[in-house]
Amino acid sequence: MKYPLKAIVAGMIITGGSGTSQATPADPEAANGPKKTKILFVVTSHDQLGNTGEKTGIWIEEFAAPYYHLADLGVEITIASPKGGQAPIDPKSELPANSTEATKRFYADEATQNRLSHTVALDKISEKDYDAVYYPGGHGPMWDLAEDPQSAALISSFYQHNKPVSFVCHAPAALKNVKDTSGEPLVKGKNVTSFTNTEEEAGGLTKEMPFLLEDMLKEKGAKYQKAADWQPFALTDGLLITGQNPASSVLVAEKLMALLTQANASK
């Protein structure tokens, strides 16, 4: 399901003469038409799968499917990462068995590939420039975004300013050190999901992970929920949206747009 974008442009005076109409905006931004919804994508910069010698990074479907779902709705997207520059892609996510319509579209889209090769460094990003944030997964976030103080501060800032924060698969690792205004874990008492222990075990990587997401979220006091392995499943709890696995990435994007549409309608 796709949710329409709604924008409200207030304070415009319409005057007419000689068969023309002119809009006089109350602010300069209105002169350029309705404000576009702006969403920040934060991706991993980490490309090493523990001590295995194998490469990791973004699971490309978790980037591509939400990216095109949102872009097709007219959303303006900025892509950032801890280090900036080239964002690594997990080579396993590029295997034919993991190909989807969204990933095929990505590999035929040189402009978006170029954007993923030139991400903005997190230290150049400000929450005030965006309406929401989305974190795609892949195993990379388990190492860098889980421990990145700039990422944690950014998530906290979005949340404190009543802006949605969304994550899929391994990306909830980025919530590991995020606190609320009282100093408690942001996920405490909230309904969340993530890549599960059994999904990690099925992939044969339990021992390679620095921690298990399901365990970490439960230890932080989250009300952890999950569906059967590999099934689409996503949860919204207030401003926090989480999805279980790659199959859940579009669900997360849909829930994110639902929150933004609701927020715009209430303005």
Predicted feature residues:
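Extended, subdomain-level signal for the structured scaffold at the beginning of enzyme domains
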Residues: T24-H161, A173-K267
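Bacterial N-terminal signal peptides
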Residues: A7-G17
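Positively charged n-region of N-terminal signal peptides that target proteins for export
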Residues: M1-K6
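Catalytic nucleophile serine of serine hydrolases
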Residues: C169-A171
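Sec/Tat signal peptide C-region and signal peptidase I cleavage site
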Residues: T20-Q22
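Conserved, well-structured core segments that form or line functional sites
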Residues: N162-S166
